[in-house]
Amino acid sequence: MLDATLKSQLKTYLERVTQPIEIVASLDDGAKSRELHDLLVEIASLSNLITFSADGTDARRPSFSLNRPGADISLRFAGIPMGHEFTSLVLALLQVGGHPSKASAEVIEQIQALEGEFNFETYFSLSCQNCPDVVQALNLMAVLNPNVRHVAIDGALFQDEVESRKIMAVPSIYLNGEVFGQGRMGLEEILGKIDTNAGARQAEKINAKEAFDVLVVGGGPAGAAAAIYAARKGIRTGVAAERFGGQVLDTLAIENFISVQETEGPKLATALEEHVKQYDVDIMNLQRGEALIPAAEGGLHEVRLAGGASLKAKTVILATGARWREMNVPGEQEYRGRGVAYCPHCDGPLFKGKRVAVIGGGNSGVEAAIDLAGIVAQVTLIEFDSQLRADAVLQRKLRSLPNVNVITSALTTEVLGNGEKVTGLRYKDRSTDEQHEVALEGIFVQIGLLPNTDWLKGTVELSPRGEIIVDAKGQTSIPGVFAAGDVTTVPYKQIVIAVGEGAKASLAAFDHLIRTSAPA
């Protein structure tokens, strides 16, 4: 299953293994079991420290466990972890084989101190770019603590479980048989949910921090660039981010970041964070801004965080980005994750052979419809305007597909369901005011982004669309408070533009520090 290049790369990685690894597969007579068998035999042939057997008795077939002789590690993949999950498999092999994790010593200690029984199950799809973060975090926890058990399950191969648990979005995480969470989660976020004292400990540590020269709020491309440019000036720099990478984490293919011909959002997000870590920057993850208290004359700005802590700084750069725009119609929140979705790449495979709608006729919506058409039975694209707004080449491709129906001049008015999952949607024909219903099982919302500025209302000046109004240097209406990226009024929401704006705001903040601290 592995081509020569991939096999060579994997062999090189496996040279880092220092302890023996046992791969035990549970297989049946199906084609997927044969595929998995061949893959595991191939992997075992690449290292003398790896042994393989097909003597497993697990009920999920095909599946396999990874263990270290004499250790109590419960780590299993149910399915064939290729696609986005191949990296998860490689990391699991390395970690079971004794190669140290990149997690901080503090996080490792926190994992090892967990008491109780934690039986995790994660449902993923091979095309989901959000799933590996969850799978890799829980795999590491299973390697480090015998109280943690983890099974990563390919929902496409175990449809009976997906149906019985009514899973309609990935990643979906279960703990001890109960729903634990849905969507991307990093290691620290998972630990924060099961280690109930973690939040209070973190807030105490944050409150004890000295004031920053530059505090960046947000960890997307704009925030990362701002932090690097500030740190390179040798000034005290901090980043408070809900999740490092921001909206980039939810982006699949990126082909317009200059000098990088092609990459994926999660890879770029990791690269951004690693670049920031090369400098003396205090990164505070899982921190969401709740209030901005502007400085009194000669004083410090204060950013209050949702976890109860607060930070002070001489200058602040707001780079909180944007989030998916919602339809705000009845039924949307009720059926979110139960048929209403926002990531076609992640959740599309769960709707194989079913009927879905895509809301939005811009590039994102049309691209989503094209992608989904290869998986689902029928796609209905619904656009509010009288015509699609996507690029002509995308529209031509869309209209060439036999299982796509386009409805324009349509206002979605309600998501319909049976109490458990989506069964359809209702829309109004804007030209006749007639109401129509479409029977379907999934709705993918692709209608743009909203700036994350709710917490800033009443402080910095906002545009009618809720964006932070900035001047040519990124200065907001509050002296010493700057903003950059998708959260601002700067047009064209692009990664490369956000990076430039972050750098510019940081340079402007440094200039402000020089001018306000200079002797009279």
Swiss-Prot record:
InterPro entries: AhpF_NTD_C, AhpF_NTD_N, Alkyl_hydroperoxide_Rdtase_suF, FAD/NAD-bd_sf, FAD/NAD-binding_dom, Ferredoxin-NADP_redctase_2, Pyr_nucl-diS_OxRdtase_2_AS, Thioredoxin-like_fold. Binds 1 FAD per subunit. NAD(+) binds at residues 355-369. Keywords: Disulfide bond, FAD, Flavoprotein, NAD, NADP, Oxidoreductase, Redox-active center. Its EC number is 1.8.1.-. It holds the Pfam family Pyr_redox_2. GO terms for molecular function: flavin adenine dinucleotide binding; NAD binding; NADH-dependent peroxiredoxin activity; oxidoreductase activity, acting on a sulfur group of donors, NAD(P) as acceptor. The keyword Disulfide bond applies. FAD binds at residues 213-228, 476-486. Belongs to the class-II pyridine nucleotide-disulfide oxidoreductase family. Homodimer. Serves to protect the cell against DNA damage by alkyl hydroperoxides. It can use either NADH or NADPH as electron donor for direct reduction of redox dyes or of alkyl hydroperoxides when combined with the AhpC protein. The active site is a redox-active disulfide bond. This is Alkyl hydroperoxide reductase subunit F.
